[in-house]
């Protein structure tokens, strides 16, 4: 588990520190640097997978993220031509420091120093106990990609959730790794039963029909609904609410997680109604309380409030939840973001509310009164 990361001279972060917990929520106005922390971790992983991190350097473009070249990666107002990531893992006594030299037109920043050693495979950022779901996830589709390698060897749903349906089809009957994630209304402890139960809190009575079709090199998805003692006909995803298909990989990734896993999820609540957004906050909190580390980017006050309620109800300890708010002083001569650390107490209360931090409802309410 990652306990701490410091980022120097990368994009809008000149020198920013993030003490992480089990559940980490990144917020802020658009363009303030929320994604920069996520990108730093993805850069390390894609460089590790391409075997450049130990001996060559930081690969800026790859399977996880595409930054461009050195001029796109280096902070505009950096006084040093270097990018440094310092990561403290719970599994290691000392922080690991990654130093890279600047090259203006190269997409591989030369390695100056790397703390990667033989134990790196045990770290969730570098092994198969990792899941990343980007904001640009797939919407409703009847047919999805197959990949035995991704779902069995990597245990990956794909960055866009493109293998989620295949994953469900293959693992539908497997029991959850974390029993606390079992929904109280689930008919069993299996993955599919619990995906259906949690998502029925978003759309009542939902049934998921995921079938692998290797003869067509695809996996099919359709939905049906409980209607009294009967079940409706199957419906194409295109004819059911957009949010269901968009959130399906998110729910699947959380319910299939095990203790020690690292999940990075962008906008897990998008396209859901407010109650569904709050539910996603609760689901993340349950996973975090059982040893899963989640790094989440969100603009949703409902998602935040779902986490706050979970803290108050003792679903997750307040100390295991970290909130980061990124902002930038438009009057400053330096184009760089600063990080603020609103704290959630045991009652779910937040100790500070910076301007722009989930405060739009209060502003609109003031105008209405």
Language-model region placement:
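Switch/communication elements of ASCE P-loop NTPase nucleotide-binding domains
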Residues: 1-56, 61, 70, 217-369
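Phosphate-coordinating catalytic segments in nucleotide- and nucleic-acid-processing enzymes
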Residues: 47-249, 253, 258, 340-369
């Amino acid at each position: 588990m990652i306990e701490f990361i410091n980022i120097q001279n990368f994009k809008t972060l000149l020198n920013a520190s993030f003490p992480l917990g089990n559940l980490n929520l990144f917020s802020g106005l658009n363009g303030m640097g929320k994604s920069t922390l996520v990108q730093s971790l993805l850069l390390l992983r894609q460089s590790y997978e391409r075997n450049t991190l130990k001996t060559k350097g930081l690969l800026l473009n790859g399977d996880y993220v595409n930054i461009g070249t050195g001029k796109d990666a280096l902070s505009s107002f950096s006084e040093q031509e270097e990018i440094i990531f310092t990561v403290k893992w719970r599994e290691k006594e000392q922080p690991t420091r990654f130093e890279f030299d600047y090259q203006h037109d190269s997409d591989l920043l030369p390695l100056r120093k790397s703390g990667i050693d033989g134990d790196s495979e045990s770290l969730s950022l570098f092994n198969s106990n990792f899941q990343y779901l980007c904001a640009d996830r797939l919407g409703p589709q009847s047919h999805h990609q197959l990949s035995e390698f991704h779902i069995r060897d990597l245990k990956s749903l794909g960055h866009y959730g493109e293998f989620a349906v295949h994953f469900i089809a293959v693992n539908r009957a497997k029991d959850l790794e974390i029993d606390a994630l079992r929904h109280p209304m689930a008919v069993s402890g299996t993955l599919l039963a619990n995906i259906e139960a949690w998502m029925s809190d978003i759309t009542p009575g939902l049934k998921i029909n995921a079938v692998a079709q290797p003869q067509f090199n695809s996996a099919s998805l359709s939905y049906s609904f409980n209607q009294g003692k009967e079940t409706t006909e199957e419906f194409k995803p295109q004819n059911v609410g957009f949010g269901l298909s968009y959130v399906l990989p998110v729910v699947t990734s959380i319910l299939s997680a095990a203790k020690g896993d690292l999940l990075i999820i962008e906008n897990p609540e998008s396209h859901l109604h407010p109650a569904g957004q709050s539910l996603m906050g609760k689901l993340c909190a349950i996973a975090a309380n059982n040893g899963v580390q989640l790094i989440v980017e969100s603009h949703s006050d409902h998602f935040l409030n779902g986490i706050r309620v979970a803290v108050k109800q003792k679903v997750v300890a307040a100390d295991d939840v970290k909130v980061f708010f990124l902002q930038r002083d438009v009057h400053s001569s330096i184009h760089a973001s600063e990080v603020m650390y609103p704290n959630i107490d045991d009652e779910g209360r937040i100790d500070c509310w910076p301007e722009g931090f989930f405060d739009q409802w209060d502003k609109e309410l003031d105008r209405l009164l």
